[in-house]
């Protein structure tokens, strides 16, 4: 006698509805210029917290110095928040008023073409 598969039982694949995975929203971590935080400290933060190579850290620091703000990196919310808090903690420990903020990256449909 042949064993017949149960025709009433659906497979897991059949019972699942297709889920569309979306990329998480990304966040920009920004460093802001001030008159007291040294350029060397900003470079050190970019190298140690944001893992930037020395040349890139220097270029970002110069952007902060010249334009008043510079992009340290773009990350998921949790990573951005962790890097923001680490930067604030280091600035406080070294008695610098370095301002670091985060803002949501523009969604593709939000961008102007």
Q: What residues fall within each predicted segment?
A:
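Terminal domain-initiation and capping elements
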Residues: 1-113
């Amino acid at each position: 006698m042949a064993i017949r598969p149960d025709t009433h039982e659906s497979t897991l694949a059949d019972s699942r509805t297709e889920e569309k995975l979306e990329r998480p929203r990304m966040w920009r971590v920004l460093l802001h210029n001030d008159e007291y935080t040294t350029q060397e400290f900003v470079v050190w933060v970019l190298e140690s917290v944001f893992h930037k190579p020395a040349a890139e850290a220097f270029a970002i620091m110069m952007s902060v110095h010249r334009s008043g703000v510079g992009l340290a990196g773009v990350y998921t919310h949790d990573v951005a928040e962790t890097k923001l808090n680490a930067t604030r903690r280091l600035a406080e420990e070294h008695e610098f008023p370095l301002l670091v903020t985060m803002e949501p990256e523009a969604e593709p449909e939000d961008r102007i073409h």
